[in-house]
Amino acid sequence: MLHAPVFDMYVNAGSHAVKVLQRTLILFDMDITVDGVIGPLTIAATQTAARRAPDHLVDAYGVERVNYYLSLADARPNLRKFARTRRGNKGGWIKRAEKYMRPRFHLSPSVFQQRTAALG
């Protein structure tokens, strides 16, 4: 369930993938610290959240992952090319994140255009 998307993000983002997971778990009312370490508390919280909302945890992680990438693009102009193509379409980061999400949670082209219009 979450193994593939967390690993996929970890390849490029390192411990930020775990921090995104931990922030997602907080949205599921898990009492956890965002420290970027997969320890026993993160594992237990992930298992609990998965039991409570098995159909939503992966999608929620994907949404948080997209938000992380867009925030990174906002803050660091040299990384914008990974979030949005020159033509204004979804870049590799966004496509990879959405690959693990159900389509109904993908950003629509119009919402993506609005969200990234200021990126230049």
Predicted regions and their residues:
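Short acidic, glycine/serine/threonine-rich helix-capping segments at coil-helix boundaries
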Residues: 2-60
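Low-complexity, Gly/Ser/Thr/Pro-rich intrinsically disordered linker/tail segments
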Residues: 52-120
